Curated annotation (Swiss-Prot):
Localization (cell): Cytoplasm
Pfam family, one: KYNU_C
Function: Catalyzes the cleavage of L-kynurenine (L-Kyn) and L-3-hydroxykynurenine (L-3OHKyn) into anthranilic acid (AA) and 3-hydroxyanthranilic acid (3-OHAA), respectively.
Gene Ontology annotations for the cellular component aspect, listed alphabetically: cytoplasm
Pathway entry: Amino-acid degradation; L-kynurenine degradation; L-alanine and anthranilate from L-kynurenine: step 1/1; Cofactor biosynthesis; NAD(+) biosynthesis; quinolinate from L-kynurenine: step 2/3
Family: Belongs to the kynureninase family.
Reaction(s) the record says it catalyses: L-kynurenine + H2O = anthranilate + L-alanine + H(+); 3-hydroxy-L-kynurenine + H2O = 3-hydroxyanthranilate + L-alanine + H(+)
Subunit architecture: Homodimer.
Protein name: Kynureninase 1
Keyword Hydrolase: yes
HAMAP family hit by this protein: Kynureninase (MF_01970)
A GO MF term: kynureninase activity
UniProt gene name: bna5-1
The keyword rRNA processing belongs to this UniProt entry's keyword annotation: no
Length: 487
């Protein structure tokens, strides 16, 4: 998309004080925005790698071959959409857990301590759900911290994808994250159906403009409504950074009798979700991106309360009624869990979808981060994110003014309400490797998607306006060098 058109389409966002201010292009101005930032204190709650750390060849903290002040400076980490940084209190939480395990052994499952950070092992999942609920806009009973993202998608589809001879299709976006694609494809095959018949891919009208307009999504839903069992979309598209209109799409699909699920991997902790109010049937997400719970950390699920009810049997010997699912003992009613009578009665809500005893080690890492989110609100985090990513966009677009041989374009929607923290930059052909080399030289951490896209995601809890300004200076230099090499 051309920079002029992109600027014209920027709308519906917060006031941008820097839009018409020439001072916005100075480092001092960026620093002044940081000075006014009500969330700035959260930055010190995270461990931000130094330039020296990134260049280390060992993990030995005594390694001292790098000594310049520059190398001791913090890197510019704009990759929270891939892996969030470690909160400082993660170590404290995990050490408390290790201490409990060491001195209590199995009795740690039920023993309370006066100075505990979390309840006994047997109840840690409840602590995680309590802190997670406000982050995704859910009732506490509607969320569970469990498993991993793709595993959870399979578990949820086992419950919510109930194909019939009339309704058997699953609609997903054409460029869904590969693991989602694999999961949907394998679920279809599991039911002895063929993906070519039962898998509907929503593709953009123009491959050069990979945004899926809401109207296009609704048209595809209408086209396949009578034969579709499930709609499963990403809340935020991992490649473009597009934030879909969850409320509108969900209501439209449900009005056609379609069950609706959302992969919120790039949305949880990023945008102000309202999964309960939007009447979403189910959702799943990982917690290691914007929610900073560590590589492969424990994930989360949402099951709307209307699907989580457990009804008592109507008479003697009648079994309880609940939504079919793949069951495990940790999802069972806590009052009867340890009776070992082989009669499964699930907990109500999302907790009833749990299978095994959760990893208390992983749960501590999740809670350590969620505790920070619960010190503020997703509305406040989202407000800063809109401002921070808006500033990034403003500086990037300004760098293209008057440039005939444009080194990049922004493929993320210009409307701030249609994106999260991430901007996806499509580089001109042949520039990617050189640009990445320069960014690495200056200790800028972003990620790439071959063949020509880099994703830049300022995380509002630990990134600053000054870092955004620095990135834009370095990125402009990287593009200049890449163009010179190309010539």
């Amino acid at each position: 998309m051309g920079s002029r058109l992109h600027v014209q389409q920027i709308k519906n966002g917060p006031p941008l004080p820097y839009k018409d201010d020439i001072r916005a292009f100075t480092r001092d101005y960026a620093a002044s925005l940081d000075a006014q930032d009500p969330l700035s204190h959260f930055r010190e709650e995270f461990i931000i790698p130094s330039v020296k750390d990134l260049k280390r060849k060992t993990l030995d903290p005594s390694e001292g071959e790098y000594s310049s002040m520059y190398l001791d400076a913090r890197c510019i980490y704009l990759c929270g959409n891939s892996l969030g940084l470690q909160p400082r209190n993660t170590k404290k939480y995990i050490n408390y857990y290790l201490r409990t395990w060491a001195i209590k052994g199995v009795t740690g499952h039920f023993t309370h301590h006066d100075d505990e950070l979390l309840p006994p092992f047997v109840d840690v999942d409840s602590a995680g759900a309590k802190l997670m609920a406000p982050v995704v806009g859910a009732l506490e009973s509607e969320v569970a911290v469990m498993g991993s993202l793709t595993t959870n998608l399979h578990l949820l589809m086992a419950s919510f994808y109930r194909p019939t001879t009339e309704r058997y299709k699953i609609i997903i976006e054409g460029k869904a994250f590969p693991s989602d694609h694999y999961a949907v494809e394998s679920q279809i095959k599991h039911h002895n159906l063929q993906p070519k018949d039962a898998m509907v891919l929503i593709e953009p009208q123009d491959p050069e403009h990979p945004i899926l307009e809401t109207d296009r999504i609704l048209r595809v839903i209408d086209e396949h409504a009578s034969t579709t069992a499930l709609l499963l979309l990403s809340a935020i598209q991992y490649y473009t950074g597009q934030y879909f209109n969850i409320e509108k799409i969900t209501a439209h699909a449900q009005s056609k009798g379609i069950v609706v699920g959302w992969d919120c991997a790039h949305a949880a902790g990023n945008v102000d979700l309202k999964l309960h109010d939007w009447n979403v049937d189910f959702a799943a997400w990982c917690n290691y991106k914007y929610l900073n719970s560590g590589p492969g950390g424990m994930a989360g699920i949402f099951v709307h309360e209307k699907h989580g009810e457990v009804k008592a049997g109507q008479g003697d010997g009648e079994l309880e009624l609940f939504r079919p699912r793949l069951s495990g003992w940790w999802g069972g009613d806590k009052a009867t869990r340890f009776l070992m009578d082989n009669h499964f009665v699930p907990q109500s809500g999302a907790a009833g979808y749990q299978l095994s005893n959760p990893s208390v080690l992983d749960m501590n890492a999740v809670v350590a981060s969620l505790e920070l989110f619960n010190r503020t609100s997703m509305a406040e985090i989202r407000q800063k994110s809109l401002n921070l990513t808006g500033y990034l966009e403003h500086l990037l677009l300004a760098s293209l003014d008057g440039v005939s041989d444009k080194p990049f374009s922004i493929i993320t929607p210009p409307n701030p309400s249609e994106r999260g923290a991430q901007l996806s930059l499509r580089l001109a052909p042949g520039l990617l490797d050189s640009v990445l080399e320069t960014l690495e030289e200056y200790a800028v951490v972003i990620d790439e998607r071959k063949p020509d896209v880099i994703r830049v995601a300022p995380a509002p809890l630990y990134n600053t306006y000054e870092e955004v300004w620095q990135f834009c200076q370095i990125f402009s230099e990287a593009c200049r060098k890449a163009l010179e090499k190309k010539d």
